[in-house]
């Protein structure tokens, strides 16, 4: 399966308006994963922080997905807001990992500015409040199974911007 370069990072890192593979989709018959707890990203979404986000340069206020869970063949609307503690300059990176079951589909480092520019944001990203509303098309042919996605974002100086993860399982429609 070929992964587009919009939905996944947009879903995982929408406050930074990033974009990447659409692997976080599940069927409507599923029960959303339990994501309660201290590391839950606020809002209607499956996102969790990788660790305590208090030292991150990006403080995410909220991420809402519609529909949640995302549905194959339907547009996914992402609304997100957050505050950056300082300007995010060129040279910032995203380490993206996507696994499908036990198979690692993606393990690559990407330039953050290249990704933000794909969705209409200028780089460097200014210090202060950021608001994003983005719609991405979800392909109808999403293989059933368990997807685990991790996006670790760092500044050019190596400071943590954010680190997010999501686990989504969807089943074959019967």
UniProtKB/Swiss-Prot annotation:
One of its GO terms (cellular component) is Golgi apparatus. Residues 20-36 form a propeptide. The keyword Zinc does not apply. One of its GO terms (molecular function) is sterol binding. Its main location: cytoplasm. GO terms for biological process: intracellular sterol transport. Residues 1-19 form the signal peptide. It is found in: Cytoplasm; Cytoplasmic vesicle; Golgi apparatus; Secreted. It comes from the Eukaryota. It holds the Pfam family E1_DerP2_DerF2. Keywords: Cytoplasm, Cytoplasmic vesicle, Golgi apparatus, Lipid transport, Secreted, Signal, Transport. Belongs to the NPC2 family. Monomer. Catalyzes the intermembrane transfer of phosphatidylglycerol and phosphatidylinositol. This is Phosphatidylglycerol/phosphatidylinositol transfer protein. It comes from Arthroderma benhamiae (strain ATCC MYA-4681 / CBS 112371). The lineage of its organism: Eukaryota, Fungi, Dikarya, Ascomycota, Pezizomycotina.
């Amino acid at each position: 399966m070929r992964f587009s370069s919009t939905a996944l990072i947009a879903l995982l890192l929408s406050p930074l308006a990033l974009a990447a593979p659409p692997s976080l989709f599940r069927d409507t018959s599923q029960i959303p994963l339990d994501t309660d707890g201290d590391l839950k990203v606020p809002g209607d979404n499956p996102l969790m922080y990788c660790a305590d986000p208090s030292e991150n340069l990006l403080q995410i206020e909220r991420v809402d997905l519609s529909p949640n869970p995302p549905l194959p063949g339907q547009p996914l609307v992402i609304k997100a807001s957050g505050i950056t503690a300082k300007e995010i300059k060129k040279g910032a990176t995203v380490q993206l990992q996507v696994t499908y079951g036990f198979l690692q589909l993606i393990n690559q480092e990407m330039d953050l500015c290249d990704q933000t520019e794909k969705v209409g944001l200028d780089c460097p990203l200014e210090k202060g409040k950021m608001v994003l509303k983005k719609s991405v098309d979800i392909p109808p042919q999403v293989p059933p199974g368990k997807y685990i996605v991790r996006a670790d974002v760092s500044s050019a100086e190596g400071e943590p911007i954010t680190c997010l993860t999501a686990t989504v399982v969807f089943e074959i429609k019967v």
